[in-house]
UniProtKB/Swiss-Prot annotation:
Gene3D superfamilies: MFS general substrate transporter like domains
Function: Catalyzes the proton-dependent transport of sialic acid.
Protein name: Sialic acid transporter NanT
Underlying gene: nanT
Superkingdom of the organism of origin: Bacteria
Species of provenance: Escherichia coli O139:H28 (strain E24377A / ETEC)
Gene Ontology CC terms: plasma membrane
């Protein structure tokens, strides 16, 4: 980049079409966040009306994560074959329909199924919107593109909390889900008014890629076996999270079965680069395990342990959600300045200083609690805004939407486990202690996985012939592609 270009403010590097593409995707992600977090806000009301245990109620949050891996795969492949725009519109329609169905749900099973539909739509929205914006913006601004986009989810959560405080006390919890149908109108507007992503257009010129992940898995020579494994994974996840299994050994066996199936899919679809894909799933798994206990159960903690009324809960959640949204934007600037991995590690380390005080302070001073949550979520949750850029850099354009969608949403099963683990621990400890302990300990795992660039490192150990040495999105070198002590300029850029 020339000196003259560097002196131009970053936002002047973007034209009107690129800003319009971002605005449309950001609004879609805001609506996604709004619809997705509604269940967390009304969890106690739903639990009381349906007569659910705490673990059953938490499984309604988990349900959306169970179907995400399949939604990420299918809608991601749609984005790779037909373009990012169509996949994004389809995703919005799916999660909106699921939200409306929640409002009509007569009982636990019906609502669980509706949450499965929401999960599929959410997964598609994540993969398609992220690749759409990242591929539409200049390479040197793509951490900002990722961070700014993901902030929309947190803003959606803030809006949902405010709507909750106005709607639920007057019209009840079902009315909140009826509002979630509005995004379908937005989806119809999107279909006609936004351009296709630049990278996808340049790569294909209107032609479909040779093979997507769906082609490989469900139209290839192993299609029958893969369909059977897909059904087996869906059944196993159903029994793990909705079957009320009491035997931990059976749950563990079913979990290992699912892991084996997902690894098999990754090996088939990515070939020699499967170690990278598997490690990306592990990174995302632990990212959800450290962050989602708080995301999912914070409203319950505020209402039960701290005995806050709905208005106070909404105020505290505003600080939390707004902090995460600001953190996504800050993370985008940090990522373009320090580099994606270094920014991630520094932000998580800083967040560790705040997690214990958040749950130790109690509920006497709402404003202090709100400020602590703002900064903790800004540093700990907000930095996840650059996670799509981090993951997408390991995939070529042909498989980026499906690769990002599948790896991210398989790892997102950590979000399904997180609230249930938190609820189980809370049966022996108070909920605040359980949430703080989980988040504090598991954040360090993520710091190590990202800081050491374990996807590249494990790829180098197991299948070095397929090692990617540079980020496919911004061209920067992967630190894990060389042994410790090796010079970065020894790296040779690869295409695969």
């Amino acid at each position: 980049m020339s000196t003259t270009t560097q002196n131009i403010p970053w936002y002047r590097h973007l034209n009107r079409a690129q800003w319009r593409a971002f605005s449309a995707a950001w609004l879609g992600y805001l609506l996604d966040g709004f619809d997705f977090v509604l269940i967390a806000l009304v969890l106690t009301e739903v639990q009381g009306e349906f007569g659910l245990t705490t673990v059953q109620a938490a499984s309604l949050i988990s349900a959306a994560f169970i179907s995400r891996w399949f939604g990420g795969l299918m809608l991601g492949a749609m984005g790779d074959r037909y373009g990012r725009r169509l996949a994004m519109v389809t995703s919005i329609v799916l999660f909106s329909a699921g939200t409306l169905a929640c409002g009509f749900a007569p009982g636990y099973i019906t609502m669980f199924i509706a949450r499965l539909v929401i999960g599929m739509g959410m997964a598609g929205e994540y993969g398609s919107s992220a690749t759409y914006v990242i591929e539409s913006w200049p390479k040197h601004l793509r951490n900002k593109a990722s961070g700014f986009l993901i902030s929309g989810f947190s803003v959606g959560a803030v809006v949902a909390a405010q709507v909750y405080s106005l709607v639920v006390p007057v019209w009840g919890w079902r009315a909140l889900f009826f509002i979630g149908i509005l995004p379908i109108i937005f989806a119809l507007w999107l279909r006609k008014n936004i351009p296709e992503a630049e990278d996808w257009k340049e790569k294909h010129g209107g032609k479909a890629p040779v093979r997507t992940m769906v082609d490989i898995l469900y139209r290839g020579e192993h299609r029958i076996a893969n369909i059977v494994m897909t059904l087996a994974a869906a059944t196993a996840l159903w029994f793990c999270f909705a079957g009320n299994l009491q035997n931990a050994a059976i749950v563990a066996v079913l979990g290992l079965l699912c892991a084996a199936i997902f690894i098999s899919f990754m090996v088939q679809s990515t070939g020699k680069r499967w170690p990278t894909g598997v490690m990306l799933m592990v990174v995302v798994l632990f990212a959800f395990l450290y962050s989602w206990p708080i995301q999912a159960l914070l409203p319950t903690y505020l209402k039960t342990d701290l005995a806050y009324d709905p208005h106070t809960v909404a105020n505290v959640l505003f600080f939390s959600g707004f902090g995460a949204a600001v953190g996504c934007c800050v993370g985008g600037f940090l990522g373009d300045w320090l580099g994606t991995r270094k920014a991630y590690v520094c932000s998580l380390l800083a967040s560790q200083l705040l997690i214990i005080p958040v749950f130790a302070i109690g509920g006497a001073n709402v404003w202090v609690l709100g400020l602590l949550l703002f900064f903790q979520q800004m540093l700990g949750q907000g930095i996840a805004g650059i996670l799509p850029k981090l993951i997408g850099g390991y995939f070529d354009t042909d498989q980026r939407a499906a690769g990002l969608g599948f790896t991210y949403n398989v790892g997102a099963l950590g979000g399904a486990l997180a609230p249930i683990i938190g609820a189980l621990i809370a049966q022996r400890l108070d909920l605040g202690t359980a949430l703080a302990s989980l988040s504090f300990s598991l954040t360090f795992v993520v710091i190590l996985l990202i800081g050491l660039d374990m996807p590249s490192r494990v790829q180098r150990w197991l299948r070095p012939e397929a090692l990617r040495t540079h980020d496919a999105i911004d061209g920067k070198p992967f630190s894990g592609a060389v042994p410790f002590g090796s010079a970065k300029n020894d790296l040779v850029k690869t295409k695969s």
